[in-house]
């Protein structure tokens, strides 16, 4: 095809010579990359006569008439946001909870509003260039037939192709629209939805459709040439596999499909731990990776390429889903650990139910307990010996009591300095929270959100944990795990550094016992590692500003969420300790008392409860955590030495504070 003819075709699209040359280069690449034998006689005839306009018409006609792609989300979208589609048409955008309106609706895809409206967050531009709003615009067009969506889409698409380039280097740097993660997300997400739907609109030109295909090919080749790691690599493979499977008309399609299948299969073995958890130890990225894997597998099944994957592939995928099910909190969400927001467990089981062999556990989650059954086991609790999560639960009921205890490594990525952290739920209410660390911005809040100061663990001399590893445990973790009908028990130790200098100040051992189904007893042992005295402090975080201090329990804090359940934080054996503190909304160097949320919960003041020792080489904190229903009588407590007597809900228990792993004896603790 003559270059001059192609340049003439694209000349009406822009008055700038550089843009025309770029668009022409896209078309030239497209014509070279399409396999004529797969495109029909009309297209082949246009090539033989070097009739560029005819080739454009024939190629566009071919792709317009192709059957709908076998994408379940395309046929049955989980729902689309009509209001968001309308805003996007006008250039009104929102990313990472930051709004921006482009004047006159003229979008600059390389503009970052957080440069002028802080805090700085590179994710705004990156996530904006995932173009998820194009999916909303496409579904809005299909639902209404209003061509305003199609016209706006073409305008934005051509602007994006003209205005963004893949950098020769540092394509993953701030300000780039060609990060590999965005390319992967686009190629299975918004770009497929937009292409598959808008190709039916007469207001989207033939040239726009073909330029979009040419850009998709460029992005797929970019991903093939520059693989990254961890969850990024899975999203990259997702994009390559989607493009190569949905558009076999391209000469490279088969090679790209095999490359993607090989990469994702190899990475599954590396990234999925033997207990089914993803090695970044974040439910967010566990969900991302599981979704990528299952979407690739689903597409392979729908396009007749299941044999590209060994049986082990589906087994590993199932293990990731079942890990999420076993870890699910009573509200059928995942407890937030490392960088995270609230992830519904159905994000795993929904796609698993239509992709993997059926399991009653998937039905149980997807139906919200109406059908199916929960995981079977000796008890409802579970320990993940490679991830290091101890999950203690009273049962699988909607209002069950639940605690997640982290005794594991940092995680391969997105880690927080929070070993020995706990999350505590009664039903869907998170009584003691881990907020997930907030947006990926450059701010004091983000620094606080990933630090020990925003987690339910211990400080030494006002310094938080600071460790470099291990990111993944080289062997099974021994947490002394016990799970019996009367109680659960787990323990873990932190003995790495504190503060910016990673000083080896102290060793922190936490022991957690769940007296089913009513309360938790925690023993925190802080031991000096340098033979010096230190001030130790325990932190607990509650998403409320309201609380009381019960007169019957000196030093105790009782939350006031105003709901059906509250949490009583009751210090035991408080000799050698200051009066507990309760702080909200403090800023500056001693920041505490904040919920640093992401997506569903933005930054807001919360409550940090602190228990601080007087200077000592060693100190032991004992804490009783008792969820109490509204109007319920508080427990009766008596402590003699290490023997604790608790009477609550008509039942008396006798426990040994020095040996939480022991069963309760008939005549007291054994």
Where is each model-derived feature located?
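Aromatic-lined, polymer-binding surfaces characteristic
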Residues: 100-318, 322
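Short solvent-exposed loop/turn micro-motifs enriched in small/polar/acidic residues
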Residues: 93, 383-385, 415-417, 451, ...
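Carbohydrate-active enzyme catalytic cores, enriched for enzymes
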Residues: 273, 277-432, 483, 614-620, ...
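CBM-like, beta-strand-rich accessory domains located in the C-terminal region of large
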Residues: 184, 347-349, 440-670
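Extreme N-terminal leader/anchor segments
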Residues: 1-92
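Residues that flank catalytic or metal-binding motifs in active/ligand-binding sites
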Residues: 129, 236, 386-388, 418-420, ...
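Cytochrome P450 core scaffold surrounding the K-helix E-X-X-R motif
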Residues: 432-435, 441-442
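Short, solvent-exposed loop/edge-beta patches enriched in aromatic
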Residues: 39, 49-56, 65-73, 79-86, ...
